[in-house]
């Protein structure tokens, strides 16, 4: 299929466009304040849409019909679909939770309260699928943490607190054994939006208030570098490409007309390109 999903502003409708002829195939009413980030099943047959007021809908692009709908929150930030097409996760602002749904019928499988060490709640900033890791990656707005949530059938147990022995059969301490165990990565500053490198080993994140980005290695679970990115980079719209034999990241900025080019080997900003807006 060669289709576009167009979320219309103002009249609460969605249009499915033929990508070859740019002609509407199906126009249907949607919930109000629909999020523009449509997500798709791996085979491209189904599109998932979330509204700001917590409704998640599933639509069949073969039959051009709605399939299922569920409400997951009062205020939802965004959604992600697992790489195997089995699960959908919704990151919520109110209540501060993560809702994991069966992507088939949108039934709720697990609701995770988003809390820190002292039970302080946090809104969700963003959630994305990390396909090679078979996990969801979540950024928290009010607590400086990144969460990795595995959706594998037999996930590796995640330590909860101090562990004396990791040897199989002799493990001591508390473990989150799943399903959907939460691995917490603690940072110095919270992250509002982020971007993966092609290997999905590194996450590049930025906050709304800061003039710099953080590079977090998901394998070792800590920040490994900082990137000078003033002007509030919009990393969700970033891309990577090869330039003069090296891998670089290009990211636009929200507060000024500029695009920053970052060398992904040493994380230096090698060029700043002014734009018209």
Q: What annotation goes with each model-predicted range?
A:
Residues 1-277:
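Predominantly soluble domains enriched in secretory-pathway, periplasmic, or organellar proteins
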